[in-house]
Amino acid sequence: MANYTGANVIVAGDVTKYQPDAFGFGIASGDTETTNFFAQTTNDIFRQLRVEWWPVYKTNIFTDITVLNTAEMVNTKVNLDQFERAGVYLFLGRFFLPALTKFRPETQKDRFERMAEYYMGQYNIEWRMILEDGVEYDTDADGTIVSNEREPLHGFRRLTR
């Protein structure tokens, strides 16, 4: 079942699949801070999609030139299920682990700083892979993704004659 509900891209259970002890360091899965981090993770993924992927998508899909500058991405049409792994990496690397670190000098980084760096690196790799594979965007809002609703970053369909 695809996630088009507008809910967060990940929940605590998704995080523990990748980092089983994540919520054992002082910030619990149900804390307000964690809830805010989930929302920030989702918002950052949508923002990055709007910046990197949406301009390519709308140029390739919309043939009416008058629509190009006015078409906005509809968040509830993006299948968030494909961003689970990227969402976990972003949550851990940008929000959760930095909240736990003491930010020591470069030579004395603590466990959380090192983990945050690792997860941000993994996020960048996963993000690129998703964009290259194709973002699932339910253009007609029918709840299913067909082949022409999966657009890679480079818009390979432009070369089709």
Task: Annotate the PLM regions.
Residues Y4-G6, I27-D31, G93-R161:
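Short loop/turn elements at secondary-structure junctions
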Residues M1-F83, D138-R161:
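Conserved short "hinge" loops at termini or chain/domain junctions
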Residues D81-F95:
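Elongated alpha-helical scaffolds
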